[in-house]
Structure formats: structure tokens, C-alpha cells
Amino acid sequence: MTTTSTSTPIFPRLKNGVFISAQTSTQESSITMATSSHGVAINHSSARSIIEQFTGILSCEEISQKLGIPITTIKSIIDELLAANFLDTQRKTIKLNNRFQSAIKSRAAHTQDQSNDAAFSQLQKRLAPELSRGTWIQGVRDGGVDVMTARQNFGVEIIGNSRTATLLFSILLASGVTNTRISLSTSYKHPTVVDSDLGSGSLRTTDLGLNYKKRVEELAREWSLFPVASSFALAQRGAPKPVVPEKNLRIICGSFDSQYVEHLLRDGHDHFFVGRAPGHVATVGPFVQPGSTPCRRCLSLIQADRVGVAELSIPLGTSDELPIAVAHQVAALAAHAALKFIDTGKTELQAAQLIVDFLDALNPQLQHFPQHPECECLWTRADVLL
């Protein structure tokens, strides 16, 4: 059972998404608190009054004094809610790693009060839904603040030029993964925005003919939850250059260069794939951690064994873009996979691939696969030399 600490002040606050039973009588003996998966019954005549004070503003002692209820009762209820993962207990503020702070003390002191800062107010409103995800991670007690702060320090590179890649780029930026960038794959056939790039809502007809990468980077400052000033603007303000993230993830969308993937494997870079399979199927995964999980070549060899040929070629005129509804779904699923790995270090896509059938998109299938005996991805260096 989870118990409250007596050394650190506790400021109880219900997690975003916990619902409370409606009051049906002025003489209640208990209330029920629940989510869609489980619930807790609090048996106390003043349970509703106590829960109403769980806003993160007052400490346990202050709530006890305000209501005239023994501190032991307050802590007992807190312990029940902590055991159900219904409660946050820490007060923290988001650290904006890339928000400019003047080196001049008088100006720095002036900017500390952000109550009238329209940009900061907008950030708070956009941040609330993201915090409501992070707060539910097991063990999180600060409302998801540390989770969101950590996202700013994680680097993601998306390699691709499809609508799915553009959508994924915008989702990760809007989710607080500030250090997300998009790189064109070696198969990129047009450096400018063309008709096939439209339809996702990210790029418009007025963008046709513009440099694709430059235009997407311009829009990134609108999409990003934590916008980053341009390098030129930072230099003008005398701000330090952004620090290159220590943790990184590569997401390969669409066709890819096998030599580039070999480079990722050799250098130990985590990566996963998003693409299209033959027929009416889109795929998310596998997620590859070099030296620990089967790689993309393992999957290719397994598929070749099943089909009976080493490789299938794509006929001329075949569109490699996904239907727009599927593109949105696949981008969202890929973003979920990336965010879970960033937030927790875990993913269900290791040695697995998520299959999304265009004609049965409401039933994605997670298919697992083993290492292929002919693939050397998990061999030791001594085995390779032999």
C-alpha cells in the first residue's frame, strides 16, 4: 500500500480525468471516484468536502485545519487515492528550456511575472491536454510536469517526404517534442511542395512551388508547443546556442536507403519504421534497438521466406501515398509509439509491427516476429569476424 511521506509537504490534486459520483443526498456516507477502468469508494461522511479541497493549492495540514478534520483521516484518504493512481501530490512548474531569458537582472526580474504574457497564457491552455496524458503514467505524482519538461530534451529525426511524415512531424512538435526535425529521404524526387503533398491540412495550395523543407520548418514554429526562436534571432539576443539532445530517435517514413539503416544499426541508434506494405496495408514498426531487438532486415527475410521471392518491385505509376484518413491514423499511431518511448523508455513495437488494413482500419493488428537466423543484427562482433 502507498503511504504518504511525512518529510515532504503534500499538495493533493486529483488527476485530470477522475470523475466523482453525483451528490444525491445531503447526508452522504461515501462517494465513488472512478475512471473508465477502475474506481474507489471513499467511506466518510465528509469525503466530498475533503475531495473538493484536493486542488493542489493546500497542503494536508492546511486542509485539516480548514475543515477541522483530523490529519490522519486526510492522509488515509490520500493513501487510498494514491494506491489507485488517482492523485498528484507535488507542485512543479514547466521548465521552458528554449524560452529566452535576458542576462540583465532587471529585465529577467521583469519577465518572471508572466500573468500578462499572452504567449504564456496560450501555452498553458495548449499544455493542459498534454499534461493530462503524462499524469497517468504509473508513478507520476507531479501532474506530468517532469514528463513534459523531459520531452524538450529528446531529439527526433523524421526521414521522409510523405503526407504521413509531415503529419507526424506536426503532431510531435505540438506534443512538446521541441527537438523534432524532418529530413528528406534519398528517394525524394521533388524539393518543392507539389500536389501530392496537399490534403493533410498541413500544407496549402498557396505553398505549391515553395521549398518543401524550408516551408515545413517555417510552419514548425506555429505547430510547436514550445516554439524555438531561429538561430539568427537567438544570436541577436545573445542567447546561447541550443544544446544537442543526448537521447535521439529516428523515424523512417516510406522508402529508405538500406545503407542508411545499416549505419543506424552499426552506430547503435534507436529507430523505427512507418510505411506501406503491398496491397491495401500500412505499417507502423518495427522499433529497433540495435543489439537488443530484431531489425528490419529480419522482418524482410521472414517476409521473403513466406512469399517465396527475395524482393518485390513496385510497378511504375503506383502511388506510395496513403489514403488521407489512413495517413492521419498511421501518423497518430506512430506519434503514440514515439511519445511512449520518450516518456517511459518502453514500446510495444519491439520485434513487432502494427498492421493497418485500409479496409478494416478500426482493427489494427500487432504482429510479432523473431530474429531471422540469417541476419547478423544480434550477432556479437566476434561472431561477425568469424
Residue ranges of model-derived segments:
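Adenine nucleotide-associated cytosolic modules
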Residues: 1-386
